[in-house]
Amino acid sequence: MNRFNGLCKVCSERRYRQITIRRGKDGFGFTICCDSPVRVQAVDSGGPAERAGLQQLDTVLQLNERPVEHWKCVELAHEIRSCPSEIILLVWRVVPQIKPGPDGGVLRRASCKSTHDLLSPPNKREKNCTHGAPTRPEQRHSCHLVCDSSDGLLLGGWERYTEVGKRSGQHTLPALSRATTPTDPNYIILAPLNPGSQLLRPVYQEDAIPEEPGTTTKGKSYTGLGKKSRLMKTVQTMKGHSNYQDCSALRPHIPHSSYGTYVTLAPKVLVFPVFVQPLDLCNPARTLLLSEELLLYEGRNKTSQVTLFAYSDLLLFTKEEEPGRCDVLRNPLYLQSVKLQEGSSEDLKFCVLYLAEKAECLFTLEAHSQEQKKRVCWCLSENIAKQQQLAATPTERKMFETEADEKEMPLVEGKGPGAEERTPSKDPSPSQELPPGQELPPSKDPSPSQELPPGQELPPSKDPSPSQELPPGQELPSSKNPSPSQELPAGQDLPPRKESFSGQEAAPGPESPSSEDIATCQNPPQSPETSTSKDSPPGQGSSPTTEVPSCQGLPAGQESTSQDPLLSQEPPAIPESSASDQNVLPSQESPPSQGSLSEKALAEQTISPGELPAATAGEPSASRPNFVIPEVRLDSAYSQQDGAHGGSSGEDEDAEEGEEGEEGEEDEEDDTNDDNYGDRNEAKRSSLIETGQGAEGGLSLRVQNSLRRRTHSEGSLLQEARGPCFASDTTLHCSDGEGTTSTWAIPSPRTLKKELGRNGGSMHHLSLFFTGHRKMSGTDLADDVEASRKRKSKNIAKDMKNKLAIFRRRNESPGAQPAGKADKTTKSFKPTSEEALKWSESLEKLLLHKYGLEVFQAFLRTEFSEENLEFWLACEDFKKVKSQSKMAAKAKKIFAEFIAIQACKEVNLDSYTREHTKENLQSITRGCFDLAQKRIFGLMEKDSYPRFLRSDLYLDLINQKKMSPPL
């Protein structure tokens, strides 16, 4: 075995053990923990693993000659379970070193230096550890196993740990009592030698230990805490933390516990019963913090000894039936949903509150000492606050998740000729404001919506873009929005959504770009090498298509204010009608906050026809953006000359608005008619647009048919209800398509609710919705209109009755007769005032009277507690059933409707009554609901019945006067 990791034969035989374990009747007899590598957590005493020689803390390197050093614990456990007869393990073992102690006894020290030694492979350990300066004696924590030299036996068979020179400023709770021995009073009895039994391990607060000022690493040369910390960690060491002890900056990530000097973090076997779902205790995000033995109060005077496992996110209540073997008593309590009540400082009791079945329950626990109570309460309160804080933050993180992802996306460097290679720089966020006087660094570019105050200087950029107007050092004008065309060099592309709008709208400042820039934008070159801008350096190509719209989005008002003679020649201008329809171009008077570019830029850009294909042809393939910006194109049938004149003059705009105002009344009248809405084909109310192929090969503007919706004015909704013939959403969608016939489909819920409200909710109109109707046209349509008018005149009274039906009180109990029939039957036995006075004697007399039962049920309905009386009546009917089969079915129905948790008509019963009734259903008799019926009857008698006697409903019956007989 000397071939492993270059060790000699003697060392490899001492460190590596090949163990063959045969399967017993209860498995292989050991448990594992941790990930990469997997370690032995515990070995059952007398089991197959212990007989084969496996020991606790052995690191598993191979399974059946397969390397498993980098496997997870769950994967290795599944592989071990699948082995039918035996397994062959190659393990790495911690070998103790024995040398004489100071008092003549035998002192055993482990040869492993730290937790890093246990986790890292043996051949890499010497390279990863860096020798630091030796620690001072007052900083050392020694850990010895001492034999008494007088009798040659271990004192009680226990290991002893000592702590020398603890820092005075360290905040820790009182430690366990020290053992009184004549030899050395500093030794503390903690852990037994038997690896299968419980180990009590000291866990120190490592963050509070000072370091040498010149050292930056903590290596294995430390003779103090670093050397002995392998026995001071829980066996569930977090994955990936093996290298953290080599760097002081990462030391706070080392898992540790600060809830006391000594805590019981022993590896124990947890047995999960069938009714408890097993947990992933090897999860690196779940750390065992405390393991304490406490008293759990099961009644007022009945207590039981339990072991509380406090993890970083949950609590486990277990009972240790055997040493090192804990049975889980109940489902785990997650810390984010529990509360802690510590009680008085003198009392050793404290409570853990949790929610179960919509009720607040609690566990009453009692510690054995004040120190234990302080330690446990400190741990629970701190981690409950952490978990509740983490549970409140995920929604906020999701809100900014997309923004954070976009900020991390680097800019793609351009590959065009003359573009300089440099690392992508992060741009400021679009909505970020810079204080006055602050200058941007040269490596960063301002985002388009970034607000720069007046007088702020723009530093020179490394690669000036072709459309930059300001020379280095020139101050910006008083406008708050800088020109978005100054953002990126020509060789770079834009990342999605963050700066895709950088050049799509011109700045609303008073200056207008020069004629050369406009000529460059309106006549883009066919290739990057043929033509360059005046401002661009030689050898650098023109900007890609993301910069082409920067000059196309100029408002018309800026062209007229410019004094450049070349601008008066009016090159092919942008038709203003496309911009006026959408109202998207920012004016000079609009504030920057209202004209934000971040959300509207993709849908608000306007491009004249024929410009984008040329720009696309001139775009280099290497600098093509990763996304496609949707373009808005005018239809081919639109007159470009009219659009050009309308875009250059403001009078035509006013005339156009006047025409729209004159047509507004006609449109509003047309909107009120649903029958001919599907025949119209205007794109006025489209919420989104889509591109389509025009008649001459160009792109055309078209409305998405699926987004068309009916829109009515408020006056049309208040008009008289129309007939049932109306077009649904699906009908409108089909009517837009060419060559398709409209078919009926189920309308939208909003339309269904609106039409049912208009027509009174009658069954005739309801049947028309779900059975369909035929498309009417011509003479059939006229006949149907005439017939519907006659039908309306006949059914006015019926419709009004249906509309006012919601104001009538209806009998909502299942199986009851309709409200109208109930009113007629109850009027026949309406009591006199003397009979009503007898109802106040007892609740039984009230329920025995038919009219009294109806009145009391109506009163309970006003208090939203009629389910109590319905349950009582159901139990009375259940007692009258004679057939055993019907009795069983009715009993299950009553339990599911009234008693089961979260039932539709759940009554207010305590848990004992609910469980007692559930047990009675195993053998159904007539009295299985007696206890629950008595509880509900008592509840009505003490609560609802006195309020009924004081209600106006009952007082009116008592004080009623003799009415004259009806005519």
Swiss-Prot record:
Keywords on record: Cytoplasm, Membrane, Methylation, Nucleus, Phosphoprotein, Signal transduction inhibitor, Ubl conjugation
Transmembrane portions of the chain: none
GO CC entries: cytoplasm; nucleus; plasma membrane
Subcellular location(s) per record: Cytoplasm; Membrane; Nucleus
UniProt modified residues of type Omega-N-methylarginine: R167
Residues in RGS domain copies: 842-967
UniProt-listed PROSITE patterns: PDZ, RGS
Region described as Disordered: 115-135, 389-705, 807-830
Record has Transcription regulation as a keyword: no
Compositional bias (Acidic residues): 650-676
PANTHER family linked: REGULATOR OF G-PROTEIN SIGNALING 3 (PTHR46848:SF1)
Name by which UniProt lists this protein: Regulator of G-protein signaling 3
Organism whose genome encodes this protein: Rattus norvegicus
